């Protein structure tokens, strides 16, 4: 039987950035091959650093998918754990080591007997940086294994062990990276009339773009426009010719995201025109669409977990954080949910360390749900 805690600790020590998960893939394949030995109803495919494990059903009417992400983050770990990251500047600070371990535990249980319906276990790379789910879908990696229903989870530090939270609508926001560069004309600070100050134009933009959320977004729906980077100039007495802004747009529906993207671009272009300078606007959403749960499937999942001993189900509000599972759920009906890990430190924090008793709880809960779906 799979040692869940040791498996998680092994994976925790080898975090890798998206599409560079070579050690992670090798480790997963080794475990998967041992688990599936002698199981003639199992097929395995790889796509770059991703893995697909397909269990052929005995009398299949549909394919049920379970997805886990496998990549780490460019963070220096500060947990002090004896099994801390062995990769300098890399850490499983978003719980993907937990996600993988739970998926392996569920795979082990699913292999106990051939399911009635097909099951697909997806070990997806590059959730954090390249929207690996979108890359795999667009590359045709699923082929005829594309699920009819897709499910997945994400650990959540502020929920207690034994708590599962989701809803029947949107769980995560869609996110869009924004890069804006104003291009004016540099000059000496003493002669501003001979220059065209990109810093001033960019400052006007930062102020004016705040009106996008306050005046273009329905307050009931909500959206976020945040710029965390503003770079301009190198010395105090020189007017800079360029100013660079780097930010994010977040919205709970794709229509709202597209509206906000359009307005941000329009405001930037309007400011540039007013200051008689050029502007470059780069909007990159890619596969980071809102994670929209299918209402009927979400209700089914919530009712199932609500009746499970040891599980406290929470109907939770959407989060403005992003998750690339939204892309796959835009193609296939499905559900994502939160799994409580009771950590005082947030996701992406260098000291984030979930409680390991969650592993057995997660495997028991998810595997029982997948068993039900596979038998329908």
From Swiss-Prot:
Gene Ontology BP annotations: diaminopimelate biosynthetic process; lysine biosynthetic process via diaminopimelate
**Would you say which domain of life the source belongs to?**
Bacteria
Which EC number(s) does the record attach to this protein? Answer: 3.5.1.47
The top EC class is hydrolase
Instruction: Write out the pathway annotation from the protein's UniProt entry.
Output: Amino-acid biosynthesis; L-lysine biosynthesis via DAP pathway; LL-2,6-diaminopimelate from (S)-tetrahydrodipicolinate (acetylase route): step 3/3
Which catalytic residues are annotated? 69, 128 (proton acceptor)
CDD domains from the xrefs?
Answer: M20_Acy1_YkuR-like
Read off the InterPro entries from this record. Answer: AcetylDAP_deacetylase (IPR023905), Amidohydrolase (IPR017439), Bact_exopeptidase_dim_dom (IPR036264), Peptidase_M20 (IPR002933), Peptidase_M20_dimer (IPR011650)
The yes or no answer to whether the keyword tRNA processing is present is no
* Keywords tagged on the record: Amino-acid biosynthesis, Diaminopimelate biosynthesis, Hydrolase, Lysine biosynthesis
The molecular function terms in GO held by this entry are: N-acetyldiaminopimelate deacetylase activity
**The keyword Phosphoprotein is annotated on this UniProt entry:** no
Entry-linked Pfam families: M20_dimer (PF07687), Peptidase_M20 (PF01546)
Q: Which family does it belong to?
A: Belongs to the peptidase M20A family. N-acetyldiaminopimelate deacetylase subfamily.
Which NCBIfam families does the protein's record reference?
A: amidohydrolases
What functional role does this protein have?
Catalyzes the conversion of N-acetyl-diaminopimelate to diaminopimelate and acetate.
Q: Which PANTHER family match?
A: N-ACETYLDIAMINOPIMELATE DEACETYLASE (PTHR11014:SF98), PEPTIDASE M20 FAMILY MEMBER (PTHR11014)
Question: What's the name of the protein?
Answer: N-acetyldiaminopimelate deacetylase
Originating species: Streptococcus pneumoniae (strain Taiwan19F-14)
């Amino acid at each position: 039987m799979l040692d869940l805690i040791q498996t998680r600790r092994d994976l925790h020590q080898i975090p890798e950035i998206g599409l560079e998960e070579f050690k992670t893939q090798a480790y997963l394949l080794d475990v998967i091959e041992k688990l599936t030995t002698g199981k003639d109803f199992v097929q395995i495919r790889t796509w770059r650093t991703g893995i697909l494990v397909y269990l052929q059903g005995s009398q299949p009417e549909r394919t049920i998918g379970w997805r886990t992400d496998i990549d780490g983050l460019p963070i220096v770990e500060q947990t002090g754990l004896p099994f801390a990251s062995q990769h300098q500047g890399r850490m499983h600070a978003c719980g993907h080591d937990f996600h993988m371990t739970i998926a392996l535990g569920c795979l082990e249980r699913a292999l106990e007997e051939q399911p009635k319906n097909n099951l697909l276990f997806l070990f997806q790379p590059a959730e954090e940086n390249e929207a690996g789910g979108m890359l795999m879908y667009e590359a045709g990696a699923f082929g005829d294994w594309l699920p009819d229903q897709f499910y997945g989870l994400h650990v959540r530090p502020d929920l207690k062990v034994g708590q599962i939270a989701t809803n029947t609508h949107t769980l995560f926001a869609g996110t869009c990276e924004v890069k804006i560069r104003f291009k004016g004309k540099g000059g000496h600070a003493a002669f501003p009339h001979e220059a065209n100050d990109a810093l001033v134009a960019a400052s006007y933009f930062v102020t004016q773009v705040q009106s996008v959320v306050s005046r273009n977004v329905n307050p009931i729906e909500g959206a976020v426009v945040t710029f965390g980077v503003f770079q301009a100039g190198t010395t105090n007495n020189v007017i800079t010719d360029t100013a660079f802004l780097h930010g994010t747009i977040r919205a709970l529906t794709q229509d709202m995201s597209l509206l906000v993207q359009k307005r941000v671009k329009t405001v930037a272009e309007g400011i540039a025109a007013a200051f008689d300078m050029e502007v470059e606007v780069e909007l990159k959403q890619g596969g980071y669409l809102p994670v929209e749960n299918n209402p009927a499937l979400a209700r089914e999942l919530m009712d199932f977990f609500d009746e499970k001993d040891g599980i406290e189900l929470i109907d939770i509000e959407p989060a403005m954080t992003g998750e690339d599972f939204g892309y796959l759920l835009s193609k296939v009906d499905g559900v994502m949910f939160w799994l409580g890990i009771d950590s005082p430190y947030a996701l992406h924090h260098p000291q984030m360390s979930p409680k390991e008793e969650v592993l057995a709880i997660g495997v028991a809960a998810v595997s029982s749900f997948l068993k039900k779906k596979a038998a329908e």
